[in-house]
Every structure is written in structure tokens, then in C-alpha cells.
């Protein structure tokens, strides 16, 4: 969370490359991408922040975000609501929407799209907060979800062969006594948050159509991570476990109308690093750095074309790597913050080391997780999609486990180093 892509350290990013290639880059929303202390000027032309005149033009007053303001909804410390992240229905106070920061960024983006008359190609970066917890949303999205259709939660029957960070968070959040009705309400609220994002995407698309930009636009919609939302009796997320509810995120790609495409859902495994690779190919830009993303354009015309045989995730840290523990988040809490149960586990340096470095390898059938200091994990996703039965010590699975280990080793060999594209001179020039 506090180690961003630093251009001074040889870590460029898609926005800066587009900006350097004469794109007009408009950025509205949170950062979590580049070092805040270095500013945004090398990455975008506009970093949108609404002012008083914007709110007057829109006809709304800004409403407080869910992480601040009145936190009475958390209840008292020590109760089973305090770390639940469950806020519930947002009160409209006589208005049609709860005009929080996401709505402001969306309205700012639509204003920009409708008013833009420049000659530069556009890049619009809109990193909204929803559906990140706390779990809360206004009507009509709060009641839009049929509670009877909310899918059941995944639950562990045993915890001793699971990562210790999970048991630590479980004990810290204190939600083990929740009834299924309470979990269903929380999960339905989360789905309502997703429905609000869907609606907001529709409004953005309408503004692109009104500006005659939709057909020429490539649109990418995805999430940076998932959420437990009650699975395994947990809320929010971890930084070093890789259940599908956390790592298998939605990814939607709408290409420009001029591109050949067979519409539909693709079942190939992809990684989020395939997003910038695809964007570069759409823009006809050769990035000035080596990367391991694979463009998705070939999947547009052939739904059966191979893409990746496996995908990977990494997280956690080694002992004594305190600088990678997200300790900065703990310093900013000023008390028992919502994230305290997780951050406390990440700060531990005793015999139990919950924030252990870990790496996941997943293919279409299996998931293998290598953990530096704890028990590895192996799941058969075909028979156990909820990843509840750890088969790492099952002798009958030894060959499959070895195959996944070898695949992870090959991936490390393929991606462990990045050689700069620019060559150096061998001799001193002065």
C-alpha cells in the first residue's frame, strides 16, 4: 500500500507512457499507483478534485465517505459489529443519490467528456472506491438484491492447515457468532454496491455516446482485488492469501468499433498485467520497458485461442522486512481502526508469522500456494471451488502438486529479472 510505482526507480506505468505519447490523461479518484510525494504531473494532465462550483453546478452537497465522519454504525468496541465493516443502507436525506466521492468523480468525468474539444487522444482513468467496504449503499440499489438469491458462503471445517493470518483476523474481527441472516444482509448490501457501480458505468457510457466518442473508445472495467464478504466468516481481504473471492476479479473489455470482435464471455485465464499490454496494442504504442503482460486482442476474434496455461499472485513478506508490513497504515489509525485485526497480524514478528511471503499458481483445475514459513496449500477447484479442503499432504495428489511446483519455478525463471531496453556504454565518456 505504501510502495508505489516509482518512475525514479525505473518503474514506469501506463498513464505516464500514454502521457509521454501525447495522450491527454484525465485522472479522477484515488491514487494507490504512484508516490504521492512526487506529484501527478508526469502521469496526467488533470488530477480532478471537485470544488464548490462543481457541486453547485451538479446541484448536490458532498456527503461524507464511509471511512470517516460519524462512525456510530460500528457500535461499541468489543461488540460483534465493531470490525464488521457493515454499515447498511445509506440515508438519502431527500435526495435521489448519496452524493459521495465516487459520484463526484463520475460527474466530473462526464463533464470532461462532454466538454472536451481538443485534438489529443484521451485516456480517462476513473478508479472508484466502490464496492470496497464498508458495506453500504443507498436506494434503489440497497433493495435491488433479492436476499433469497444471495449465494451461500464458503466455510472452513478445519483451520489448522490454513494460513495463520486467517485465524488471527477471524479472532480479531469477532464475527463467529453471526447468523446466516446477518451474513446474507451484509452480502446483499455488497452486491447492491456492485449494482451501483454498474449503473454508474452506464451513465459514463451514455456520456461517451453523447460526445460521439464511444465507438472510438477502448474501455476496460476491472477491480484491483476481491472481498471475503462473509466467506470463511471474514470480511474485507488479506494481503497474502489468494482465495478466488479475493484474486479472481471481473474484467470487461470493450474494444473500439473498428476492431473485429466476436462478442461474448471468454474463459481463458488472464492476469491484470494483460490490461496494459492490451491498452498498448490498442494505442499502437511500444512501451519503453520490458514487461510480462500478454495482449488480449487475439481473444476478440477467436474465443478458443490459447492465452495462459496458469496465472500467479504474490503477497506477504519475509521476516525482518518490517518496511513491507504496511506499518504506515497502523500509524494512521489513531485507535482501533477498521483494519486493526488485519494490520496487527501483519506487524507480528514472533514465532507465529502470519504475514509470511506466499505465491500462488492457478490453472484451470488446481491451485497451489507456496508459503515461506507455513504449510503450503493445494486445492482441487473442480471438486472444491471454495478452497476449503487443503490437499497438500494427500499422497494421491503428489504428482499434481509437483507439476504445479515446477510450473511456479518456470514462472520465476521467466519473470525474476527485467533487463532495461536501453543499453549502456562500456567505456567512460569523460
What residues fall within each predicted segment?
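Catalytic-site neighborhoods of secreted/periplasmic enzymes
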Residues: 1-96, 315
Amino acid at each position: 500500500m505504501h510502495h508505489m510505482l516509482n518512475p525514479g526507480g525505473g518503474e514506469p506505468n501506463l498513464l505516464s507512457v500514454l502521457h509521454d505519447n501525447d495522450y491527454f490523461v484525465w485522472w479522477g479518484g484515488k491514487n494507490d499507483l504512484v508516490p504521492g510525494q512526487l506529484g501527478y504531473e508526469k502521469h496526467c494532465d488533470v488530477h480532478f478534485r471537485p470544488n464548490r462550483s462543481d457541486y453547485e453546478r451538479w446541484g448536490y452537497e458532498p456527503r461524507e465517505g464511509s471511512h470517516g465522519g460519524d462512525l456510530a454504525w460500528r457500535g461499541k468496541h468489543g461488540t460483534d459489529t465493531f470490525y464488521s465493516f457493515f454499515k447498511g443502507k445509506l440515508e438519502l436525506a431527500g435526495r435521489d443519490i448519496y452524493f459521495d466521492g465516487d459520484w463526484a468523480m463520475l460527474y466530473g468525468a462526464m463533464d470532461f467528456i462532454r466538454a472536451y474539444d481538443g485534438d489529443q487522444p484521451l485516456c480517462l482513468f476513473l478508479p472508484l472506491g466502490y464496492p470496497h467496504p464498508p458495506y453500504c449503499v443507498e436506494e434503489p440499489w440497497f433493495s435491488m438484491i433479492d436476499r433469497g438469491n444471495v449465494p451461500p458462503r464458503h466455510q472452513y471445517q478445519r483451520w489448522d492447515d490454513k494460513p495463520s493470518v486467517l485465524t488471527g483476523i477471524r479472532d480479531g474481527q469477532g464475527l463467529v457468532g453471526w447468523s446466516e441472516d446477518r451474513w446474507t444482509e451484509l452480502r446483499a448490501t455488497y452486491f447492491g454496491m456492485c449494482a451501483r457501480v454498474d449503473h454508474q458505468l452506464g451513465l459514463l457510457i451514455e456520456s461517451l455516446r453523447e460526445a460521439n466518442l464511444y465507438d472510438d473508445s477502448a474501455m476496460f472495467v476491472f477491480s484491483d482485488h476481491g472481498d471475503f464478504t462473509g466467506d470463511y466468516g471474514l470480511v474485507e481481504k488479506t494481503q497474502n492469501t489468494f482465495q478466488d473471492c479475493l484474486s479472481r476479479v471481473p474484467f470487461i473489455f470493450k474494444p473500439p468499433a473498428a476492431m473485429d470482435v466476436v462478442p461474448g464471455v471468454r474463459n481463458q485465464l488472464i492476469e491484470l498485467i494483460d490490461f496494459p499490454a492490451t491498452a498498448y496494442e490498442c494505442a499502437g504504442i511500444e512501451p519503453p520497458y520490458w514487461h510480462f503482460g500478454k495482449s488480449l486482442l487475439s481473444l476478440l476474434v477467436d474465443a478458443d485461442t490459447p492465452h495462459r496455461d496458469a496465472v500467479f499472485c504474490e503477497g506477504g513478506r519475509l521476516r525482518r522486512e518490517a518496511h513491507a508490513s504496511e506499518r504506515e497504515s497502523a500509524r494512521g489509525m489513531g485507535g482501533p481502526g477498521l483494519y486493526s485485526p488485519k494490520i496487527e497480524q501483519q506487524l507480528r514478528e514472533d514465532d507465529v508469522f502470519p504475514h509470511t511471503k506466499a505465491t500462488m499458481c492457478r490453472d484451470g483445475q488446481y491451485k497451489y500456494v507456496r508459503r515461506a514459513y507455513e504449510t503450503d496449500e493445494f486445492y482441487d477447484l473442480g471438486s472444491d471451488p471454495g478452497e476449503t479442503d487443503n490437499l497438500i499432504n494427500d499422497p494421491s495428489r503428489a504428482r499434481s502438486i509437483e507439476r504445479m511446483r515446477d510450473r511456479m519455478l518456470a514462472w520465476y525463471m521467466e519473470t525474476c529479472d527485467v533487463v532495461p531496453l536501453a543499453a549502456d556504454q562500456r567505456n567512460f565518456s569523460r
